[in-house]
Amino acid sequence: MNRAETEQPQFAVIGCGLIGRKRVLALGPNPPLLYTCDLDAARASALAAEAPGCTAVTDAARVFADPRVTAVIISTLNASLAPLALAAVRAGKHALVEKPGALNATELRAVADAARSTGAKVRLGYNHRFHGAMLKARELVDAGALGPLMFLRGRYGHGGRKGYDREWRADPALSGGGELIDQGVHLIDLAGWFLGEFPTVEGHAATYFWDMAVDDNAFLSLRTADGQTAWLHASCTEWKNLFSLEIYGRTGKIIIDGLGGSYGPERLTYYPMPVEMLGKPTPPQIHEFPTDRSWALETEAFVDDIRLGRDPSPGLAEGIHTLEVVERIYARAKGG
């Protein structure tokens, strides 16, 4: 792990489905992609064809054994994320691991222990932090435009599709859970990014519509040590795809709607609320973000993690905390 900071990392992508393809496109021609790896040889080959000089393989051990590979992007089913990340960091490879990073927090703690031993940098793939509206919200919050934060509300959902309850996400052995560990973790991560950790976790997960052994809706009330609250709902019975995040401070609020595509145009509306104007809000400031660059920006951040030797954010600590929240909600659903 002692390569020069200015050296260009060389990558491999493990998992060549929809997200793996997004990751390859986000890499672009630089940094170099040496391998695509997937249990489906045809899928690995198809993705390798999009990156000149890339080799398709079906055995991840070949990737980990190649000393030229600096970093791996792991975008498999949830059940394979932590085992592959653990093998990667033990081999001295940096890793960008797609959310949620593991089936549970225990798996992710093992990755963290190994990363501390080898010095590998591990970033969790929560690309929503890199959406334009989220970055603008972060800028406004950090500048004090909202004053001290009080609470936030988040809703995220889709309506599934025919046969959704027979896909891998409906199998807890492969997914670790349902809608909470799928889209819900994005909400938990964003809430933690703005408010901090949540020692108080309340809520429940339930299955209302889909014929599956995992949840299709989750409702969360999370509180920081200072009492700031995150009120979250994740759903795959949201018949019209929806993303909404509202952040409230003492002197203003932000509303983020949409993520682009089927979730509608991505827009941030900032409502200043000076104390002297209480009850008479000033005209809002509206910012629109027609282009999603989140995947590319997240990849750039990961490359900088490696080059600068900095701790990724979100990294393993944030990923573990998010999964601890998930586990506490699932325990409540089971009467624990």
Give residue ranges: language-model regions.
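C-terminal helix-rich "cap/oligomerization" subdomain common to oxidoreductases
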Residues: 1-5, 71-73, 301-336
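Predominantly a Rossmann-like dinucleotide-binding segment in NAD(P)-dependent oxidoreductases
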Residues: 128-204, 208-211, 336
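Contiguous beta-strand/loop segments that form the cofactor/metal-binding neighborhood of enzyme cores
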Residues: 189-262, 292, 296-310
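Active-site loop of classical SDR/Rossmann-like NAD(P)-dependent oxidoreductases
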Residues: 39-42, 286-300, 314
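Beta-loop-alpha module in the N-terminal Rossmann-like domain of NAD(P)-dependent dehydrogenases
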Residues: 51-114
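C-terminal capping/lid region of NAD(P)-dependent oxidoreductase domains
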Residues: 6, 120, 147-151, 331-336
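Basic phosphate/pyrophosphate-binding loop/patch that engages nucleotide-derived ligands
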Residues: 113-121, 135-150, 249, 253
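N-terminal Rossmann-like dinucleotide-binding module
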Residues: 1-51
